[in-house]
Amino acid sequence: MITVNLESDGVDLPEIDGNWISGICENILTDFEHSEAALTIIFSTDTKLRKLKKEYFSVDMLTDTISFNLEDKGEAIDGEIYISLKRVSENAKTFEQDFDKECKRVIIHSVLHLLGFDDQTSEEKTKMTQLEDY
């Protein structure tokens, strides 16, 4: 079973289709052969994500999303995805996209990280960008 919960931390939940979010998360996880998952998507602030980035990755910078898989072993994913609404809004302006589309892209990107995809090299970035067009 796959469950997706939306939460907010210091911000109002964005007006985004929760059914779409649940559906796309379930589709991605199922396509990559994960039938057991619990995802919590937490919409938050730049301050919170910067703090998490510094604490867990030793990098002091703004970021649009951070993903944590809390499950150590097995096929099940117990994931927390933190999303900075301000970064998503800034990204949308930079990439000339509407907020909704950019928010959806960031959610897909975050789920891919939970599945083990990375974006540190140019090859990895290219692969993730292709998969973001889910």
Label the model's feature ranges.
Residues 1-104, 115-134:
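An acidic/histidine-cluster motif and surrounding catalytic segment
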Residues 112:
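Periplasmic solute-binding protein
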